[in-house]
């Protein structure tokens, strides 16, 4: 939830895809994720829209799809319903314990990187620095609150879920009906880019490429 659109730097799609990147925006006071997504959706124009979101961005693009017509939704390292949240987050929602979570540690970049991508990147901290520019404390507190309290019960139609089997943020044991990548962590968009470059176009077959618009949302 702290990453920017540079997480898509290694993704290379055919020229007939018209790609637009959606950068994060600061939420308005007391704005829900539904209201936030409605505001973002007004910036999206075109036909045959495919929304792609990573992690918290995967939740946001699902909310955006409730306001605009989409051809397909692709989420990566994310969740489709509240039931796919890990047990600790589900307990946090019930007890409100997450409100005690202090995000002051974001000033320590290493702690932030380990939280977002998992301990597997410990030896590559500096390589990930450019991807984690969203470090506003108010924003992170808001996103944690919206994530833990997301209440979606049923996934949208025409959704494709791609997930790493070794994801520690959203453990695969809680994930239903997804394409699982062996050895994949929460950072598969970076570490499995060759797989995405080969397989994403296959996921977008039967689209009129004259009108296609891909909206790539960062890990908001």
Residue ranges of model-derived segments:
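Conserved acidic catalytic loop of the alpha/beta-hydrolase fold
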Residues: 18-20, 34-49
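Short glycine-rich catalytic loops that host catalytic nucleophiles or stabilize transition states
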Residues: 22-24, 174, 179-184, 190-192
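Catalytic histidine-centered segment of alpha/beta-hydrolase-like enzymes
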Residues: 30-31, 184-199, 214-219
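Gly/Ala-rich beta-loop-alpha elbow adjacent to hydrolase catalytic centers
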Residues: 52-61
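Flexible "cap/lid" loop of the alpha/beta hydrolase fold
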Residues: 69-102, 213
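Conserved alpha/beta-hydrolase catalytic His-Asp/Glu region
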Residues: 105-151
